[in-house]
Amino acid sequence: MNRNIIIGFLAALLLASCGYPKKPEAAAPSPQGAGKDNLPLNAQLIGSTPIKNQGKSELCWAYGMLATIESEHIMKGDSVNLSVAYVARMMLQEKALEYYFAQGKKPISMRGMASMLIHYIDKYGAQPYDSYEDPKDVNYKILCRKVEKICDGAIAQKSGIEKLKDELNNLFDKEIGYMPAKQVHMLGAEYTPLEFAHSVCYPEEYVSLTSFTHHPYREYFALEVPDNAMHDQFLNLPLDELMLHVQKAVENGHPVCWEGDISEEGFTHAQDNYVEVQKIELPVTPASRQKEFEQLRTTDDHVMEIIGTFLKDKKRYFVCRNSWGKNWANQGRIYLSEDYLRLKTIAVFMSEAAFLYNQSPKDTPQKPYI
């Protein structure tokens, strides 16, 4: 097999866990970056926690949103590193009960949108990463099938949910890890998981933004993508305004959680970690963006955290921190061009403080918060 074929094969593997089923399951090191640091000196970067690796999971939405929450705290001089494994365990338990009561007619999946993370920690709380670290070798797709098998047995025996919960907890302890203590100890204080979650992210702290022309601007609507299982509402903004909010948020030290399409050639074959759109796709307009979405060429593939921005040759780029480990791209980071964001963004999430910077609250419609 020649070198070009090998590189092409590895690049295809980059369409990792958060892609649709037709895309490969797991991330692999990028042949373009090989973990080398080629970040321009003029890049403005926001503080962030260490790069994590989602492995063979579909949990990019949880990794990306938790990373955004962590960076927002670092910006404030606080330090917090949050557990994805805890959220995954709570989600699996909830979906197992739904599967049981649906008598097996509601398959279990770990896919989701970044906004779902807020719902889960608001309901179940959160744990520090050090208290419940991500297991290195768990395959959540296989784990979902194991959960369904246990539920199928409980359905056949009509055994009830208490016995089912015991069996599930035994499975989760073995596959994900034993649950930490009931109290969270942080900086000399003691919290319940729910109190801890609300201390790092209160329910109304983050806003969800998008830009499409099939709904009125400055109104909220439920995004029509398969992973919006909770029918979350997004504020619809004109494209230029959406991009300005992203740029200003990052320039003022706030992270932004980005959700969008990574199936493009510009992403899978990024040159020196720079992600561009094709020349025939320029200029990117609201109409061309809408056409990509309506013809299903812009799909909800992946979630990353935007932690910086810079100009190169008079073009703006956004530094995205991924969850595919430090050996991918530039030590886990890649640079999306402004045109790529304009064309391939499904939604962005930022703190209310970032959104309202230089904007009067009266200019924004009353929102159904995440």
What feature does the model see in each segment?
Residues 1-4:
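Positively charged n-region of N-terminal signal peptides that target proteins for export
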Residues 82-190:
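Papain-like cysteine protease catalytic cores
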Residues 15-17:
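C-terminal motif of bacterial Sec signal peptides marking the signal peptidase cleavage site
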Residues 166-370:
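Active-site signature of cysteine proteases
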Residues 23-46:
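N-terminal regions that are enriched for targeting/export leaders
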Residues 19-21:
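Bacterial signal peptide processing site
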Residues 46-58, 101-109, 229-236, 245-246, ...:
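Second-shell loop/turn segments in exported
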